[in-house]
Amino acid sequence: MLAGLIVVKSFNSGRTASVHTSLTSIMTAAATALDIIIMAAGKGTRMKSRIPKVLQKLAGRPLLQHVVAEAQSLHPRRVVVVTGHCADEVEAACAAFTLPEATPLEMQFVRQEPQLGTGHAVQQAVPKLPDDDGVVVVLSGDVPLTEASTVAELVKACGGDQLALLTVRVSDPTGYGRIVRDANGVVQRIVEHKDASDEQRASIKEIYSGIMAAPAKRLKAWLSQLNNDNAQREYYLTDVVAMAVADGVAVVGHCITDALQVAGVNSPLQLAELERAHQLRQAAALMEQGVRLADPARFDLRDDVRGVLAELSCSTDVEIDVGCIFTGRVTLGEGARIGAYCHISNAEIAAGAVIHPFSHIDGGGDA
């Protein structure tokens, strides 16, 4: 899901509507109740920051806010956020997030103390999910760009009686859990990087994203059987895959080609790389609709510091020079020309206007 909804008037409004229609049709076809668990307890030590990792910002928005907004768009029964490191700060921030839809979201918090692995984190959330019907989706609070339609497809693949894993093939799977399939291509288990053999590390390129959809009743049973007999002495959520196979439950590896959707953040460098890749996609979306960007690698669309969600609406024949930053809700009229290194926030630029280089325009938070 894009952090900034790019609206190109007379072009993109129909496309946006079709995306929402598609998402609704997928969830209707899945025909199952949905609960979502978001894991947000990690310390994020490699960020070397006092700010919790899930509150680090991408496109002006906390990573966790991206994920909560994604969850909201799927219209679940309830969302449980698992916190741990700086729990008070994360929970307070999460409760104050500005979300794109007006639909109320039932969001609860549970704390993972101590932090003993991903399986242990989900175990803490289970008491908040009293119903045994439906599907439980597990998301990661530091994986911000998964599209809601992708998660909806995963729920559909689960079908209420299968275990569905979101996977992707990458050139360098170092550090990720690898998908182990049998000779017929059927998923058998996930092996974590530190527990993988040299042969598995060299040959398996398909990785588990950290996102899964599972039948609620089955998931609860598997979680109760987890142990920490591994190199890290942690309770791995990934161990439920082997349990599903042992129980005769089909395991579906829903493999996507877009690695950006499952990219996580563990360091400032990874955050910067993900930011730039995301901004390039936003720039490309504009250019595909006719907006002329002098250099798409030097374009930024972000939420503003007051929390106004990013939305850039462009009419026809708009030109944007290098290094421009747009924050909050901005409208550019027909033929508007934005000079280099301008910062425009919550403003409407008239048709035919010429904004000179290095201009800073702030229309306030109610544009």
What are these regions, as identified by a protein language model?
Residues 88, 146-231, 249:
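Conserved core of the sugar-phosphate nucleotidyltransferase
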